[in-house]
């Protein structure tokens, strides 16, 4: 099973193309992320199918509800065999602590991460929804709240990963979506970085979607990402 930093986002509406991509990639070289659209369409059996193929699965459902409800949802998420699950840090310390406690009751506890500020959010978006910005300050506040609640790490923009590492320590995970190599389009993400820059800035895991999933040769695109990371490791 892979210990790669790369997590490929299976942003598909149904199981067919998701499993087809999984069969073209390698569990030795990446983990896979299942989000809301795919999970709602296909359910736990999709996660099971990926786990049986040898993949670590990040179940990206971003739970945000009252503590008891989130605790129950996390137990159910753990039962799928997921390697990592997440909640929204905006749910508060009590909710995150309840999630962590619930996962601790499971036999093979998944990693728990907390979403800080979505990578589609800019400072203007934060002002629009009434959150004190700028984004990097909001991310740090939420990361420290998550760490205090016993969460394993956060989901944050790669642009804030170094700040989170400084505030929360090296052992606190920084899972970074919005990763776009120079050869890929930016898409709808507002705060993006290249894979090499993200790792240099403190990211522990990189979530990559369209640069791989929409590539004519997904395994070749994955190899290109691996080469970028290897070159960064050598600097």
Swiss-Prot record:
Superkingdom of this protein's organism: Bacteria
Database matches in InterPro entries: Aldolase_TIM (IPR013785), OMPdecase (IPR014732), OMPdecase_AS (IPR018089), OMPdecase_bac (IPR047596), OMPdeCOase_dom (IPR001754), RibuloseP-bd_barrel (IPR011060)
The keyword DNA-binding appears for this protein: no
PROSITE patterns (alphabetical): OMPDECASE (PS00156)
Protein EC: 4.1.1.23
Keyword check for Metal-binding: no
Keywords linked to the UniProt accession: Decarboxylase, Lyase, Pyrimidine biosynthesis
Annotated substrate binding sites: 11, 33, 60-69, 119, 180, 189, 209-210
Top enzyme category: lyase
Active site: 62
Metabolic or biological pathway: Pyrimidine metabolism; UMP biosynthesis via de novo pathway; UMP from orotate: step 2/2
Gene Ontology CC annotations of this record: cytosol
Catalysed reactions, as listed in the record: orotidine 5'-phosphate + H(+) = UMP + CO2
GO-annotated biological processes: 'de novo' pyrimidine nucleobase biosynthetic process; 'de novo' UMP biosynthetic process
Molecular-function annotations in GO: orotidine-5'-phosphate decarboxylase activity
Family per similarity comment: Belongs to the OMP decarboxylase family. Type 1 subfamily.
Quaternary state and interactors: Homodimer.
Role noted for this protein: Catalyzes the decarboxylation of orotidine 5'-monophosphate (OMP) to uridine 5'-monophosphate (UMP).
Protein's name in the database: Orotidine 5'-phosphate decarboxylase
Gene: pyrF
